[in-house]
Regions:
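Conserved Nudix-box catalytic region and its N-terminal flanking loop in Nudix hydrolases
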Residues: 50-91
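Charged phosphate-binding loop/patch that engages nucleotide di/tri-phosphates or the phosphate backbone
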Residues: 162-179
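Acidic, metal-coordinating catalytic segment for phosphate/diphosphate chemistry
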Residues: 14-45
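A short coil-to-beta-strand element that immediately follows conserved catalytic motifs
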Residues: 94-103
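NUDIX/MutT-family hydrolases
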Residues: 132-164
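Extreme N-terminal basic, low-complexity initiation segments
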Residues: 1-12
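Active-site-adjacent beta-strand/loop module that shapes the phosphate/pyrophosphate-binding cleft
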Residues: 105-130, 162, 167
Length: 179
């Protein structure tokens, strides 16, 4: 019956998740029970593109080792666009103009360290010659899309493929929120 179907759907909807979304902790000071929510960490990455040089790829100092787009974590109280510009300056020395949002990438396995959710921008360097590795980048260089170094970490190969589709006119960018 419809009522039985609705009841089963409701039970299925309220079934426990495979991975816990929260855990119960005890406050060491007062002994009260508190809930810690296990949310993805907000991050941002930027495909910095110069038509003559290609895209900026960094070689990572920290685990996982390999090559990646420059990016990092959004600080508490920080607008994601500001975090993107800050991270580019820290990792590449470049002052970047954000052209638009390529996409949001949030697969739980995209980063082996923890679940992250990245807002990925396409950016243009104001002075491409200022490129220099910094922060947690061993090296930073421009690479043509057809000659990227390997291995590419995280889901950045997928992001770069999406960027290639944007360059080919097969994808659009979402606007950047004004500061």
């Amino acid at each position: 019956s419809n009522m039985e179907l609705a009841a089963n759907m409701l039970l299925a909807y309220h079934a426990p998740l495979e991975a816990p979304m929260q855990k119960e902790l005890t406050c060491p000071a007062c002994g009260h029970s508190v809930i810690q929510y296990l949310n993805p960490a907000p991050t941002t990455d930027v495909v910095i593109y110069d038509p003559e040089r290609g895209v900026v790829v960094i070689e990572r100092v920290n685990e996982p080792h390999g090559f990646a787009l420059p990016g990092g974590f959004v600080d508490d109280g920080e607008q994601v666009e500001h975090a993107a510009v800050r991270e580019m300056r820290e990792e590449t020395g470049l002052d970047v103009e954000l052209l638009g949002v390529l996409g949001v990438y949030s697969r739980p396995d995209r980063d082996p360290r923890r679940h992250t959710m990245s807002v990925v921008f396409v950016g243009r360097p104001r002075d491409a010659a200022a490129l220099k590795a910094g922060d947690d980048a061993a090296r930073a260089a421009f690479y043509p899309l057809d000659r990227l170094p390997q291995p590419i970490c995280f889901d950045h190969a997928r992001i770069l493929a999406d960027f290639g589709r944007w360059l080919a006119g097969e994808r659009t960018l979402a606007p950047v929120e004004p500061a």
